[in-house]
């Protein structure tokens, strides 16, 4: 009995010391987002993983505030309405010069449809490889999520565009019906032509 007890005691002391050294390296536990209250979040990379960070967003922007983009506004508004209604909808790339209202249009759509369950997830271009992890967290939720990548472009030889293409093509797996990707770019070609 005494030898087993002293070995067990030594083991527990050592395990305690190891845990004390490891715990500061572990990510802090994250609270689950209440999507009934939270309208937007940003994918935040942390080490080899990441988490959704809730954002406070303004719902002041209206689609009618955007001038000179009537056709684009109507097309994107119709696509978004179809998405909310559970009808087929397309991923969208908004292309144009800086300051032409591309990002504002997406935010105005959130303002218009938040009460109908539309939510916005911002994801940086450099984090596109994490798209499957982000989608995995959203797939079983009742809300409709637009994954929003602002200022999308790639350099020649970068592999990230292949990840994006496979997600858009649905070749990783069937894209969930409650997730759509909207991106903006001020480049005419997302990947430079050779």
Residue spans for each PLM region:
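AAA+/P-loop NTPase substrate/partner-engagement loops
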Residues: 112-145, 151-157
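Interdomain "pre-motor" coupling segment immediately N-terminal to P-loop NTPase/helicase cores
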Residues: 2-54
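Walker A/P-loop nucleotide-binding motif
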Residues: 86-108
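Phosphate-binding P-loop
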Residues: 55-57, 81-89
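Short loop/turn elements that form and flank the Walker-type P-loop nucleotide-binding site
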Residues: 87-89, 116-117, 140-143, 175-178
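Pre-Walker A adenine-sensing motif
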Residues: 71-85
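Dynamic helix-loop-helix/coil hinge segments at AAA+ ATPase domain boundaries and subdomain interfaces
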Residues: 3-9, 51-75
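Conserved catalytic/switch belt of AAA+ P-loop NTPases
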Residues: 140, 155-194
